[in-house]
From Swiss-Prot:
It comes from Mycobacterium tuberculosis (strain ATCC 25618 / H37Rv). One of its GO terms (biological process) is histidyl-tRNA aminoacylation. It is found in: Cytoplasm. The gene is hisS. The keyword Ribonucleoprotein does not apply. Belongs to the class-II aminoacyl-tRNA synthetase family. Keywords: Aminoacyl-tRNA synthetase, ATP-binding, Cytoplasm, Ligase, Nucleotide-binding, Protein biosynthesis. This is Histidine--tRNA ligase. SUPFAM superfamilies: Class II aaRS ABD-related, Class II aaRS and biotin synthetases. PROSITE patterns: AA_TRNA_LIGASE_II. Its EC number is 6.1.1.21. It is an enzyme of class 6 (ligase). GO terms for cellular component: cytoplasm; peptidoglycan-based cell wall; plasma membrane. Pfam families: HGTP_anticodon (PF03129), tRNA-synt_His (PF13393). It catalyses: tRNA(His) + L-histidine + ATP = L-histidyl-tRNA(His) + AMP + diphosphate + H(+).
Amino acid sequence: MTEFSSFSAPKGVPDYVPPDSAQFVAVRDGLLAAARQAGYSHIELPIFEDTALFARGVGESTDVVSKEMYTFADRGDRSVTLRPEGTAGVVRAVIEHGLDRGALPVKLCYAGPFFRYERPQAGRYRQLQQVGVEAIGVDDPALDAEVIAIADAGFRSLGLDGFRLEITSLGDESCRPQYRELLQEFLFGLDLDEDTRRRAGINPLRVLDDKRPELRAMTASAPVLLDHLSDVAKQHFDTVLAHLDALGVPYVINPRMVRGLDYYTKTAFEFVHDGLGAQSGIGGGGRYDGLMHQLGGQDLSGIGFGLGVDRTVLALRAEGKTAGDSARCDVFGVPLGEAAKLRLAVLAGRLRAAGVRVDLAYGDRGLKGAMRAAARSGARVALVAGDRDIEAGTVAVKDLTTGEQVSVSMDSVVAEVISRLAG
């Protein structure tokens, strides 16, 4: 007899299985709900795209493009990449389908897996789940504040409260070139290794994003972009903060924040949770005023975010909280006989049509085994019937919380169950 080895999920790729999957779904759906309540429409995008889309949009000097992308040649020898982030794909779709020719801003939200080849650790996976929003077509600081407030509301709707919003401005095209020269002058005066010096020549902001402690110490006194904003960029940032104050969204200004993607301009922000240790970011985003034009579309601005579902789940656990209902069903049917099995299946269908989650005991478990299964399911009510009960036209309705049990006529079961679940 041939023996086969078992398989495991690829390294750095998490499974979400019951009961943990219930919390994952609740977090994802809760974050999405906050966007939909603000008028954002759902968009579904390909898992893989033309590699050039990310190279041009995200930036070739970023770690994402240079080190972390899953890129391969397909059977037509075309270079494709598993999406490492969502914004570039959304902008591509907006251009391709002419969404920017209609009413502006275009407001879109999405959820799904993204892929980065990183060293796996708690909260940092090679397949990461995100919820994102993008608002494209209007350069208005009030829209920046709305997007940030949506993320804040999404986290709070889940009961998460141990996070903080860090925010800064990355300036605009009128002040960034001068700051770039100033920063390069500072960096080239340091004793940098060859690779870091090369990156400083391409995009010096990438050096400030380096996580190595020794380099962070060397750049601690680097000039800060917030001190060199143009009048337009400063006014934009001040207005964003004023709107956040009015909306009651607390924030901390972090002048040393650098986002990991090259397309960000003006407003940039990150939500962090100290309960996650080194991987404290649970989401972030910013404005990208040049990305549409850079990818072949109109010269329209945009603002968006990506929120980590995986990390939000971990943040909730760090606070000792859960989201979602881990119960598999509301009602569990226990048929004791073939006639009872058929009748309870019909009742289950009626209850499901009424919006009640119903499961049934299958196989010949006997009463004790079936009731143990009912308890494990998390159901609040059990329906118990043998063939004699079916002949009499009755079903036992048992409250699994109190233990109370009543005999109910077949025609009254649906109403009785709904009444008990509502109580």
